[in-house]
Regions:
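Internal alpha/beta domain cores that form substrate/cofactor-binding pockets in large enzymes
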Residues: 61-64, 68-77, 81, 91, ...
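Short, well-structured N-terminal submotif of metal-dependent ribonuclease cores
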Residues: 1-38, 51-62, 116, 120, ...
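Acidic, PIN/NYN-like endoribonuclease modules and their adjacent C-terminal/linker elements
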Residues: 1-3, 46, 100-129
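Conserved glycosyltransferase catalytic-site signature
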Residues: 8, 41, 96-97
């Protein structure tokens, strides 16, 4: 079974049927349904902001639970890898670097994102949409 890391943009789109990436994010997660799905804690927190504002945090947690998605904590090696990525790619935001660093540190087969600016940052990045 492969490991797939999920960016906040994918979970945000999955949780919001009006999101422009909703269908593509849903299809991508279905295509990786046999994989072990993980999301960095930083991306998980980012994806939960809208549901928290709407009083739908329990719903969002249930979706993550139904996907058997593991929330991966930030570790010193991941933080250091993210800092190195951020230093090399000045336009890359730190939250994005944390997701990519998580994927590379865990040797993920895929890192799913809706952010086209991630193309070419890591071989495992798959831009959805």
């Amino acid at each position: 079974m492969a490991l797939t890391v999920v960016d906040a943009s994918i979970l945000i789109a999955l949780l919001d049927s009006d999101d422009g990436l909703h269908a593509a994010a849903t299809a991508a997660l279905l295509a990786h349904a046999v994989d072990e799905l993980t999301i960095p804690a930083s991306a998980y927190s980012e994806a939960l902001v809208r549901p928290a504002r709407a009083g739908r945090l329990d719903e969002a947690r249930a979706v993550v639970g139904a996907l058997l998605m593991e929330v991966v904590p930030l570790s010193p090696p991941i933080a250091e890898a993210a800092a190195t990525l951020r230093a090399r790619h000045q336009a890359l935001r730190l939250p994005d670097a944390l997701v990519i660093a998580t994927g590379t540190s865990l040797e993920a087969g895929s890192i799913l994102t809706g952010d086209t600016r991630w193309r070419g940052l890591a071989a495992s990045v798959e831009v959805v949409g």
